[in-house]
């Protein structure tokens, strides 16, 4: 298992988490190919982190899977924008840390599962119940 950490990316963590969720558990080569065609800014950074994690472990991209892809909030840059009547409003420029872990893909042999037959019993049809109340007749006057 190998890791790669990219710090202080000028990107909102919530936007980057949407992309990280897509590649989690995928083959690294397939993940980088799909990130290449995503229009989002964070896709480029996450693809860079995946390729860096693969290189850190000395693996080939087709033999590892993305075990975890985590995006954490980093420091927020705060700026001010002048507004009307001498006031100012705050502009938040969020940054994020991207951590990617890749691990060798485990080859699992398929196990045959024996499925037990379900025994079904036939139920007797439900009986109609009659009410014991007498019908009340309205008298017309």
Curated annotation (Swiss-Prot):
The organism sits in which domain of life?
A: Bacteria
GO MF assignments: rRNA binding; structural constituent of ribosome
Region (Disordered), start-end ranges:
110-141
Q: Which CDD domains match?
A: Ribosomal_L22
State the SUPFAM superfamilies in the record.
Answer: Ribosomal protein L22
InterPro entries, per this entry? Answer: Ribosomal_uL22, Ribosomal_uL22_bac/chlpt-type, Ribosomal_uL22_bac/org-type, Ribosomal_uL22_CS, Ribosomal_uL22_sf
Q: What keywords would UniProt list here?
A: Ribonucleoprotein, Ribosomal protein, RNA-binding, rRNA-binding
Question: Does rRNA-binding count among this protein's keywords?
Answer: yes
Q: Output the Gene Ontology cellular-component terms.
A: cytosolic large ribosomal subunit
Low complexity bias locations: 117-134
Write out the GO biological process terms. translation
Q: Which family does it belong to?
A: Belongs to the universal ribosomal protein uL22 family.
How would you summarize the oligomeric state and partners of this protein?
Part of the 50S ribosomal subunit.
Q: Which HAMAP family match?
A: Ribosomal_uL22_B
As for what it does, the entry says: This protein binds specifically to 23S rRNA; its binding is stimulated by other ribosomal proteins, e.g. L4, L17, and L20. It is important during the early stages of 50S assembly. It makes multiple contacts with different domains of the 23S rRNA in the assembled 50S subunit and ribosome. The globular domain of the protein is located near the polypeptide exit tunnel on the outside of the subunit, while an extended beta-hairpin is found that lines the wall of the exit tunnel in the center of the 70S ribosome.
The molecule here is called: Large ribosomal subunit protein uL22
């Amino acid at each position: 298992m190998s890791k790669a950490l990219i710090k202080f990316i000028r990107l909102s963590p919530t936007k980057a988490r949407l992309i990280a969720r897509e590649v989690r558990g995928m083959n690294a080569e397939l993940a980088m190919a799909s990130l290449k065609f995503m229009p989002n800014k964070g896709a480029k950074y996450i693809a860079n982190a995946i390729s860096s994690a693969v290189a850190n472990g000395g693996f080939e991209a087709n033999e590892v899977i993305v075990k975890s892809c985590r995006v954490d909030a980093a420091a927020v840059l705060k700026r001010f924008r002048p507004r009307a009547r001498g006031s100012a409003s705050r502009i938040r420029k969020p940054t994020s840390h991207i951590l990617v872990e890749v691990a060798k893909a485990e080859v699992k042999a398929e196990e045959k599962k024996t499925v037990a037959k379900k025994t079904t019993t036939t139920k007797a049809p439900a009986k109609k119940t009659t009410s014991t109340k007498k019908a009340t007749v309205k008298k017309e006057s």
